[in-house]
Amino acid sequence: MSEEMMQTSPFECPAWFDGKKINETVFCEEFLRDYPMVTVNDAFFTVNGRVHDENRLKKVIYDRIKYYVTSGVAKKVTNLLDVMRMECCTAKLSLYQDRIHVANGTYYLNGTFSPEKDFCRNRLPVAYNPDAPQPVTWLHFLSQLLEPEDILTLQEFMGYCFIPSTKGQKMLLLIGKGGEGKSRIGIVLRALLGSNMNTGSIAKVETSPFARADLEHELVMLDDDMKLEALPQTNNIKAIITAELPMDLEKKGQQSYQGDLYVRFIGLGNGVLQSLYDRSVGFFRRQIILSTKEKDPNRKDDPY
């Protein structure tokens, strides 16, 4: 949400206020003209991707109506947000696998770039720079962490995570003994993906009925400290990794619904992912396992 949206001033009686009450439909139509949005499965999206913090939307609405509503303000703000959710509802927001939505426009996988922005589910917080210098520090770090062929695999998988696709049908596991610096991968991914990445537990995906809904509209789910306990089942993980059709999602206290999942799993830990009962090829073929190098005893870590 831009700072512009956080400012409003009462100069004259707006069209949506008749002196006694607010016309909710007219208010929402005006609001959406100023700040275009659409909703998919009750989630708001702008040209900058998903609106993760609806409290900021409520603050903008509050700033507009606070001069005209003197009681029950919080309830009125919530009601207006719900009406707006219906007003801009769309059946589907297309997922494009031939482009990456970046902060300064759209980068197409054929190598072209456009500064134009369209409504999208995910926009990365980083800008495309065709003249960016070689990431020397990053490459040096990777050379200490992984073998050359594994570096290529890691970078290819990270690129795969930038588009909403599950065609790779793989998850990535980075395994080490500890202290190698593999958790830095998560820090870099957070900088690249921003709020389009969810951090949590892969095991929770199998044990919580609400975990799948938390992954809707996310590009990556990172588990930076995988549990060594074997998974009681693997159905959900396998289904999500290869998902091509809408899946049944459930939020607490709400009726389940069909939603698209294109999240990719990345796990960091001291051991591989295990299952109590699943010994099938289907479980293990979905995993790309990279083992880190032994930590150089002469390496001096930068605490900053």
Question: What kind of region is each of these model predictions?
Answer:
Residues 227-228, 270-275, 293-298:
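Conserved nucleotide-binding/hydrolysis micro-motifs of P-loop NTPases
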Residues 210-217, 249-269:
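AAA+/SF3 P-loop NTPase mechanochemical coupling elements
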Residues 39-42, 46-111:
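Long, basic/Gly/Ser/Thr-rich N-terminal segments
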Residues 258-262, 279-304:
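Phosphate-sensing "switch" segment of ASCE/P-loop ATPases
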Residues 199-207, 234-256, 301-304:
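Substrate-gripping "pore-loop 1 plus following alpha2 helix"
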Residues 2-5, 32-50, 55-56, 100-219, ...:
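P-loop NTPase catalytic core of nucleic-acid-dependent motor ATPases
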Residues 20-26, 190-194, 230-247:
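A short, contiguous, amphipathic alpha-helix enriched in charged residues
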Residues 218-242, 257-263, 275-283:
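Conserved AAA+/SF3 P-loop NTPase catalytic/coupling segment centered on the Walker-B
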